[in-house]
Amino acid sequence: MIMGQYLFWLANAHEPIENRIPELPNFISVLYHRFQHTTWAQFLHRWENIIFAILVASLISLVAYLGARKKEIIPSKFQNLLEIAVEKFSHLILEVLGPEGKAYIPFLGTLFIYIFTMNIFGMVPLMKAPSSSLNITAALAICVFCLVQFLNIRNMGIFGFLYHLAGSPKSMLEWLLAPLMFSLEIISQLSRPLTLALRLFGNVLGEDILIGTFALMGVVMISSVETFVGIPLQLPFMFLGLLTSFMQALVFTLLSTVYILLSMHKEGEKN
């Protein structure tokens, strides 16, 4: 009912609808529409992506705490399912990183669960997918970038890493080309978090816009009969959204795994 009212308001607002980005309402946007002149509503509206990101993190932490507290000698079907999922995920990471990758499974597993939960959070009524904000996806990409650079410096040393960025020159010609190689490698390093952030942001935002557009169409189609209950045209796309949410979380995690692999140099490459 609230969704229909809010989308109906969007369709009949004074601002032309073609200038708006169709998006399913969340409880913060509903409160802001009702109390937009109050300070607290403006604060919530300004920081809504951060608030939803914190809500997702809190929800995951709560579920993990409750799940860990109720350990059973004979595992339930749900616990068996989770154990199988963790085992498959760990096997996937170890296939890419090798035995040394065991240390990175907690980080990569947390990254996958957090991103996937954020992606599907927008499908919950009156919630929003925080990963549809570039600020959130950029923060995640920067975390991966910082970890990769830390591993590079730890494995090769600062000067060894700079030498690697220059293309590991040995001959005179290679030293002459070192500034060019250094510039290209810097661009390559910086493009990694940029592409990670933009890919996740663009796909999740596009998914939300698609669902919001069809939800709005369902309301507008029967607006003439003066009802706030629209046709659920967005329902098929929500099932598709579950698949794309999983795939985007998996792609982000696998690319992060590859970047970690590229930073795991052999001891002989240290300077």
UniProtKB/Swiss-Prot annotation:
GO cellular component: plasma membrane; proton-transporting ATP synthase complex
Major localization listed first in the record, in broad terms: membrane
Keyword Oxidoreductase: no
InterPro entries in UniProt: ATP_syn_F0_a_bact/chloroplast, ATP_synth_F0_asu, ATP_synth_F0_asu_AS, F0_ATP_A_sf
Topological category with respect to the lipid bilayer: Multi-pass membrane protein
Record-level Gene Ontology MF annotations: proton-transporting ATP synthase activity, rotational mechanism
The keyword Membrane appears for this protein: yes
Membrane-crossing residue ranges in chain numbering: 47-67, 107-127, 133-153, 209-229, 235-255
SUPFAM superfamilies: F1F0 ATP synthase subunit A
Assigned keywords, A-Z: ATP synthesis, Cell inner membrane, Cell membrane, CF(0), Hydrogen ion transport, Ion transport, Membrane, Transmembrane, Transmembrane helix, Transport
Subcellular location: Cell inner membrane
Domain of life: Bacteria
Entry's Gene Ontology BP terms: proton motive force-driven plasma membrane ATP synthesis
UniProt subunit comment: F-type ATPases have 2 components, CF(1) - the catalytic core - and CF(0) - the membrane proton channel. CF(1) has five subunits: alpha(3), beta(3), gamma(1), delta(1), epsilon(1). CF(0) has three main subunits: a(1), b(2) and c(9-12). The alpha and beta chains form an alternating ring which encloses part of the gamma chain. CF(1) is attached to CF(0) by a central stalk formed by the gamma and epsilon chains, while a peripheral stalk is formed by the delta and b chains.
Purpose: Key component of the proton channel; it plays a direct role in the translocation of protons across the membrane.
Family named by the database record: Belongs to the ATPase A chain family.
Protein name: ATP synthase subunit a
